[in-house]
Amino acid sequence: MRDMEEVREVKVLEKPWVEKYRPQKLEEIVGQEHIVKRLKHYVKTGSMPHLLFAGPPGVGKCLTGDAKVIANGELTTIGELVERISNGKLGPTPVRGLTVLGIDEDGKLVELPVEYVYKDKTSELVKIRTRLGRELKVTPYHPLLVNRRNGKIEWVKAEELKPGDRLAIPSFLPAMLNDNPLAEWLGYFFGNGYTDSEERVVFESKSKELRKRFMELTRKLFQDAEIKEDSGKVYVSSSEVKRLVKSLNKDSIPEQAWKGLRSFLRAYFDCNAEIKDKIIVSTAGKEIAEQISYALAGLGIVAEVDDKGSVIISDPENVSRFLDEIGFSVEEKKEEAKALIKKSTLNLGIYVDKELISYVREKLKLSFYENETMWSPEKAREIAWKLMKEIYYRLDELERFKKALSKSVIIDWSEVEKKKEEISEKTGISVNEILEYAKGKRKPSLEEYVKIAKALGVELKETLEAIFTFGKKYLGYVISDEIETLEEVRKEELKRLKELLNDEKLKKGVAYLIFLAQNELLWDEIIEVEKLKGDFVIYDLHVPKYHNFIGGNLPTVLHNTTAALALARELFGENWRHNFLELNASDERGINVIREKVKEFARTKPIGGASFKIIFLDEADALTQDAQQALRRTMEMFSSNVRFILSCVTGDTKVYTPDEREVKIRDFMNYFENGLIKEVSNRIGRDTVIAAVSFNSRIVGHPVYRLTLESGRIIEATGDHMFLTPEGWKQTYDIKEGSEVLVKPTLEGTPYEPDPRVIIDIKEFYNFLEKIEREHNLKPLKEAKTFRELITKDKEKILRRALELRAEIENGLTKREAEILELISADTWIPRAELEKKARISRTRLNQILQRLEKKGYIERRIEGRKQFVRKIRNGKILRNAMDIKRILEEEFGIKISYTTVKKLLSGNVDGMAYRILKEVKEKWLVRYDDEKAGILARVVGFILGDGHLARNGRIWFNSSKEELEMLANDLRKLGLKPSEIIERDSSSEIQGRKVKGRIYMLYVDNAAFHALLRFWKVEVGNKTKKGYTVPEWIKKGNLFVKREFLRGLFGADGTKPCGKRYNFNGIKLEIRAKKESLERTVEFLNDVADLLREFDVDSKITVSPTKEGFIIRLIVTPNDANYLNFLTRVGYAYAKDTYARLVGEYIRIKLAYKNIILPGIAEKAIELATVTNSTYAAKVLGVSRDFVVNRLKGTQIGITRDFMTFEEFMKERVLNGYVIEKVIKKEKLGYLDVYDVTCARDHSFISNGLVSHNCNYSSKIIEPIQSRCAIFRFRPLNDEDIAKRLRYIAENEGLELTEEGLQAILYIAEGDMRRAINILQAAAALDRKITDENVFLVASRARPEDIREMMLLALKGNFLKAREKLREILLKQGLSGEDVLVQMHREVFNLPIDEPMKVYLADKIGEYNFRLVEGANEMIQLEALLAQFTLIGKKK
């Protein structure tokens, strides 16, 4: 068994064989000779027609070299950048560590990595000019992001652009905008400075303020400067200034000025700005004008550049932003500029797609309406946000409707008829009326129908409300309350609702609005498009994922490299992976992956000099109509919702179940695959996992980094993995040492462990219930006078006897038979003649009675000559009907039993308090130790022992704060209990002679079964102070999970919170009062609690203090940081105290890490530095106090320094919406490792090592791609010989024994699919190294074909019962679903020895019953009905 477990573990982590044994060369591709032949021809000729192309082969999407780009934060030209990296060579050149600015799928500005740069030549270009002075020269096929007059936002080829289209430009750019004296001096010099014939620098200005400022800066910056002022001019003589000025070129912003752009711009504008109806700055030429435009964009100021090289700021918003961010030093210019804010001249608005927005409004019945087609950027964001708020509400409402409409409104009238008395009692409808409804004689009203359904346990309220509301609100009609039509209406509405939610145009419209609401773009109108001919050198940058960057003469959103698609390994050699993509288009769950991969793959240039790429669409012949439409749409637009993950965390990273059990993500994979864990914790609380993946990070090209936080938390993740930070989601690449991330304080130390034990011993609990029944005046036999008074165990005895008597009725005696039997002796043989005289009946009549007595086994007869003798074998009783059984039971047990009760007993039914309690306990609380509900039960029990008590009337009371009780009530509901409303009362008490008034809060639960269960767990009824406390045995014997939750409930109720002041905490304890008679038991209880705490490495002590009324026993958690940290992060509190306690724990964690990890490192550096210098210098360099350094030199023990934050400061500055802001203190690159990730259904995040992780690879929501052409290779199924050959090769490599039977079984299931065959082989190998047909069918969840055929033939031959038994055997043996069975029946029906018309008929029937299953019909009933159809058709033939 150990060997088997080891093998399974390896299989979880091993690369799937379907990838491991993928064909590496064209020669290895089998069964596709027609394709291989064509592909080899393409290899030979280098030509590739009839495949997906994003542009004509050999033509890239590129820019001319003078286009500007911000690379690694510096402004340069793309030509200079690419030439420097590529050393002038044509084609692609890989590059690392280069980043540019671009936009994400929401139109937000982000820093993006460049994968490679590209240089090429072309004979055609398109020149584009815009209203704000942008001038771009790009290849005709270069896509640009534009807003067209019809409102669409899309990537359009340059050659297709028209005047009036609006080009996307960023609303701001990050830049170096700090103040800097030298940059300011350069601004003055570039603005109004020059060099005279004596090589002096001259600054000329009418403003006395500017001349004074220029002189101040000159004295400060240049020590040898001689300054003279004369007639509005300042003359500077200095060798330093002379050298500086000679190195400058006034045509561009100098390198020194980029370090303080704000200062440079202010000085430059002070000198050169002219203010009329706009701010106009004359420059030395277009180069510096364009650079100034980029610099202004760093502050979100959009500027125009005219043909003369003037920079123009005209829009009031941009003028206002200029004054706020840069401003003028000259007061006169400042006032003139302020006057411009009232005017509006610049139009950077966006055309909106009114038709698409109207479609969304109509479909989702939105109230908001706006008629204009041109919106300003601010208006677009404002309106889109208003619409999105409504949309979120509507989509949430529709999801609720979908859930409600998925439930049928049809009830089972046969079940109603069986339970008519019970239903009548619950509903108040008479039994006769219910019978008439059940038999169809009368129709109930809708109100009565709902009541009857509710009595059956079917809740129809939500479904009916959904039917009426959805119909009226979204479909525009009012539905009658005729029950006959409701189910049809429900089905139709559910169909319409699903169509609405899957409406691609609606999804596109919602995505469009999201883009409008979130983008950070403006739109510059194109005024001229001109085609150029000649010989041009062109350049481009490849930016993976988002495929765009900010560049151009003025900041513009540009698309990166896209080229044709190409072939395979032989064609591309070592570069084949960059140029080849294989997709499975038929997998419905993979449609979104197809969209994303096609989009990203088609945008990159081929590597290695090839002219095109190729996309393989595997199993294209299996594409459904929906899949074909989805694939077509993917080629046309970017919109999709990708749920696969490419960026992940390492295997040691811990994720958390919703009840905060931690599990290493590598182990989670196994639990998830086996169905043990289906949910994890994330930002929204709990979320369902829909996918989990593992692979080596090298596959996606992202190395793994280790991040260490100031709390000591460590996490390892790929570079593109995203974590939640105070500024939003950030990739690991972008997180630096000193960066801040958000941490969700989580409990730790309690692992998820599969534990199949159940928490209740049902046999012991049933025996305990006798005590409960006796308390309710039920009695055992010999004490009870009637059956009703009996305890349940004795009712069971009578039930068994009643069933025995029912079995004897067939052989029971009539009154006359009993009389004759009484006359016959058991000791001696009596002659028949003598018996005839005693009985006084005729010989014939006596012979008939004797024959019956002999047949029933009461007598035996023998014949001697002509005489016949009779002897009794056993006694008998008159037993022919229920009344006879009633009489016998009353005689044997000595109690009165009603006739109605006897009838119930004879039908096998018995009722009793213990049965009712046991049934409810089994249904609600008989769970495994690893079940989440076990933790809730433990938590509630802990709370009851603290702030609850059991009343004698079966009620359970809880007393606490209102907030605490509201949280507790949620747990009680999860247990299937119905807590009361919270009761609020005034209270008063006296403390040291002083009256104190307040309010108390209570709630209660009335549930006899839960009350009995708590008593079984030794929770006492009444006053616990007098009776004492006990830790339930099931808790003591349980796993860490239930022990932790019990402690949390107990401390949540009765524990005190930690009291913190500045750096330190104390005060965590439990305090319980006891009387003399309960003292020993209470102390034992707290000793047990202390033992439980020790399992979490928490130390505590117990004290006993006498009082006037008795004793106070305290359990005190030992007050030191390490112990408190263990308690708060491993145990903690349930309910209201929980949040505060977690924050205290996180503070202590940071404090201890600072004290034990960070400070020792600083101390070591302090000693080293102070030894070679002095204490004062060391303190200044390290940023600590001098006392700290001196104490380290003295060898004094390290303590918290005064500059460490206090707890009060932590709560104020570090806590954000329940998260803790923590700094990254160390970042290390680990290289390529095996990584893991999970994907959640509702929110793309999960908690990992306390950090909030994102399922990083989400896709674009709105931007549309270039139209593409595609011709698909059609792959046919492989023949069995080809698959068998490959399987034998794999089996040999893996050391497997592949039997012939096992091989044939795999071939049968694979149906020509090589990947399916390999996957089945790998799965079977996890069971046994010998591959047999038995383990193949087991892992594939398939029945043997011969079993399916046998079942169908039995039915066709009229042997329905045996066919039915065979069906049940298949379902139980193989664990198949009904649909699985139908699929195999459909396949095997064509292999039956019957004529073709019958095969056609049966195939049609199988399809009909499959449809019924899809519609939600009962599996077993439908499968048996299908076999019945087989039987009927067989008889007809």
From Swiss-Prot:
The keyword Nucleus does not apply. One of its GO terms (biological process) is DNA-templated DNA replication. It comes from the Archaea. Signal peptide: none annotated. Coiled coil: none annotated. Residues 185-301, 940-1098 form the DOD-type homing endonuclease domain. This protein undergoes a protein self splicing that involves a post-translational excision of the intervening region (intein) followed by peptide ligation. SMART domains: HintC, HintN, HTH_XRE. GO terms for cellular component: DNA replication factor C complex. One of its GO terms (molecular function) is ATP hydrolysis activity. Pfam families: AAA (PF00004), HTH_3 (PF01381), Intein_splicing (PF14890), LAGLIDADG_3 (PF14528), Rep_fac_C (PF08542). SUPFAM superfamilies: Hedgehog/intein (Hint) domain (SSF51294), Homing endonucleases (SSF55608), lambda repressor-like DNA-binding domains (SSF47413), P-loop containing nucleoside triphosphate hydrolases (SSF52540), post-AAA+ oligomerization domain-like (SSF48019), Winged helix' DNA-binding domain (SSF46785). Keywords: ATP-binding, Autocatalytic cleavage, DNA replication, Nucleotide-binding, Protein splicing, Repeat. InterPro entries: ATPase_AAA_core (IPR003959), Cro/C1-type_HTH (IPR001387), DNA_pol3_clamp-load_cplx_C (IPR008921), DNA_Rep/Repair_Clamp_Loader (IPR050238), Hint_dom_C (IPR003586), Hint_dom_N (IPR003587), Hint_dom_sf (IPR036844), Homing_endonucl (IPR027434). The keyword Iron does not apply. The intein interrupts the potential ATP-binding site. Part of the RFC clamp loader complex which loads the PCNA sliding clamp onto DNA. The complex possesses DNA-independent ATPase activity. Belongs to the activator 1 small subunits family. RfcS subfamily. NCBIfam families: intein_Cterm (TIGR01443), intein_Nterm (TIGR01445), PRK04132.1-3 (NF003158), PRK04132.1-4 (NF003159). Heterohexamer composed of four small subunits (RfcS) and two large subunits (RfcL). This is Replication factor C small subunit. It comes from Pyrococcus abyssi (strain GE5 / Orsay).
